[in-house]
């Protein structure tokens, strides 16, 4: 049917279109593999936060796809990777939450230093 926008592929997958479902599953698997690679590269053993506009829209697909399998399947590191959490951030403004938390922490540190 020509070129589809990513949102169209996702929408078609939700309606059960087999080709769109395969595309979304493949995307989720690749996303998991890359996220797992980044854990290994960065040593992010405490976990990975999945953010961005596509995460809330694809949350169910991420949960039921090969995301975790590909995230964890890292050869001799597989058992360690199985203990690394991957968390989806679904808040619409996570940057503002982070900035507010940073400001509160900075204020508390300043107040504590002055005491």
Regions picked out by a protein language model, each given a short descriptive name:
Residues 1-115:
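ATP-binding/phosphotransfer module of carbohydrate and carboxylate kinases, centering on a glycine-rich
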């Amino acid at each position: 049917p020509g070129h589809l926008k990513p949102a169209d592929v996702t929408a078609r997958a939700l309606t059960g279109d087999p080709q769109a479902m395969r595309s979304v599953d493949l995307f989720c698997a690749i996303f998991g593999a890359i996220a797992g690679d980044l854990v290994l590269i960065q040593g992010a053993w405490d976990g990975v936060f999945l953010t961005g506009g596509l995460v809330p829209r694809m949350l169910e697909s991420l949960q039921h796809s090969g995301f975790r399998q590909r995230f964890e399947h890292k050869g001799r590191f597989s058992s360690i990777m199985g203990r690394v959490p991957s968390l989806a951030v679904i808040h619409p403004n996570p940057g503002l939450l982070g900035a507010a938390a940073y400001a509160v922490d900075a204020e508390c540190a300043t107040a504590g230093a002055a005491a």
